[in-house]
């Protein structure tokens, strides 16, 4: 299978490219604009892989996208601006990349008559939930500009399925963690700060709850959905591991050998969703199960970010 992975030099995208090359005979083309969150370094050791080609470029470049899609059987779209705080400070690049960029890919996919288009989305499109778990049938209710643009892209993908019969799939994943994550994200940021004896800024009272999945488990789920998922469907990918931000911070401090005195409660973020939780029953029915515990994943992260496992 010939796979075009957009945003494949970012955190999850690069881990997925590595996963494909390690676990299949697929030919993979990675397209990435190498903005601040993407780097060739994330693909170190794989840039010269015989089944891999890296292309620097933007998903909004229709001519380039057309050239790449013409040789692809499937498209997996990770390309996105993905930081909530940055989206609150300025939404324009999020709208441009996450919505308009997705439209460019969809149009190219339609013209090329591809076999599958997998849109990588997020549980944040559902908004917050205080009890229970979101299923794929729940309405979208995003509460910040980032998640709003991802929800918009999801709806656009769905519309191309309904109006053009494009063979689309959508995955919505909970919070990922693991190697090659940008240092602005909570777990790598707090690991580094804890190890350096710095304070760890926790929004509000730290009670906001997130569901965490190790990135390798997510990549395995994405691969199963890509190959076995039913066209036109949405699949939640979650681990069932829910932790408050304070609990996550305490586990990081314990893993690094820091002190709880390093915790600093700061003013809460605008539009800060209280809790995310998703039901992954539908994805598990395809034969997937998460394998990594949070503690084992965190240990691997500490080794990676503190230089013991390059």
Swiss-Prot record:
GO biological process, one term: S-layer organization
Phenotype caused by lack of the gene: Impaired formation of the tetrasaccharide present at 'Asn-532' of S-layer glycoprotein Csg. No effect on 'Asn-47' and 'Asn-117' glycosylation of S-layer glycoprotein Csg.
InterPro entries assigned to the protein according to its UniProt record, in alphabetical order: dTDP_Gluc_deHydtase, NAD(P)-bd_dom, NAD(P)-bd_dom_sf
EC number: 4.2.1.-
NAD recorded as keyword: yes
Function: Lyase involved in N-glycan biosynthetic pathway that takes place under low-salt conditions (1.75 M instead of 3.4 M). Participates in the formation of the tetrasaccharide present at 'Asn-532' of S-layer glycoprotein Csg, consisting of a sulfated hexose, 2 hexoses and rhamnose. Involved in the addition of final rhamnose (sugar 4) of the tetrasaccharide on the dolichol phosphate carrier.
Protein name, per record: Low-salt glycan biosynthesis protein Agl12
Species name: Haloferax volcanii (strain ATCC 29605 / DSM 3757 / JCM 8879 / NBRC 14742 / NCIMB 2012 / VKM B-1768 / DS2)
């Amino acid at each position: 299978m010939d796979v075009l992975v957009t945003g494949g030099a970012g955190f999850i995208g690069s881990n997925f490219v590595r996963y494909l090359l390690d676990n299949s005979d697929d030919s993979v083309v990675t397209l990435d604009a190498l903005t601040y969150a993407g780097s060739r370094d994330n693909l170190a050791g794989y840039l010269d892989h015989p089944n891999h080609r890296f292309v620097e470029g933007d998903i909004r470049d229709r001519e380039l996208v057309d050239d790449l899609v013409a040789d692809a059987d499937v498209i997996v779209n990770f390309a996105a601006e993905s930081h909530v705080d940055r989206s609150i400070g300025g939404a324009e690049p999020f709208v441009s990349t996450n919505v308009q960029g997705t439209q460019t890919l969809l149009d190219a996919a339609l013209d090329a008559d591809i076999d599958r288009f997998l849109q990588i989305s997020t549980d944040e499109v559902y908004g917050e939930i205080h009890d229970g778990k979101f299923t794929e049938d729940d309405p979208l209710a995003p509460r910040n500009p980032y998640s709003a643009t991802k929800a918009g892209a999801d709806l656009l993908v769905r519309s191309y399925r309904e109006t053009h019969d494009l063979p689309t799939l959508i995955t919505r994943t909970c919070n990922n963690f693991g190697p090659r994550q940008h240092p602005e994200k909570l777990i790598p940021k707090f690991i580094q700060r804890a190890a350096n004896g710095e304070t760890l800024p926790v929004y509000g009272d730290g009670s906001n709850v997130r569901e965490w999945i190790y990135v390798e488990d997510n990549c395995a789920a994405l691969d199963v959905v890509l190959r076995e998922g039913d066209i036109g469907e949405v699949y939640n990918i979650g681990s069932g591991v829910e932790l408050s931000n304070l609990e996550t911070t305490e586990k990081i401090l314990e893993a690094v050998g820091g002190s709880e005195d390093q915790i600093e409660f700061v003013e809460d973020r605008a539009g800060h969703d209280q809790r995310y939780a998703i039901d992954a029953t539908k994805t598990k029915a395809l034969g997937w199960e998460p394998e990594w515990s949070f503690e084992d994943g965190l240990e691997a992260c500490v080794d990676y970010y503190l230089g013991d496992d390059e």
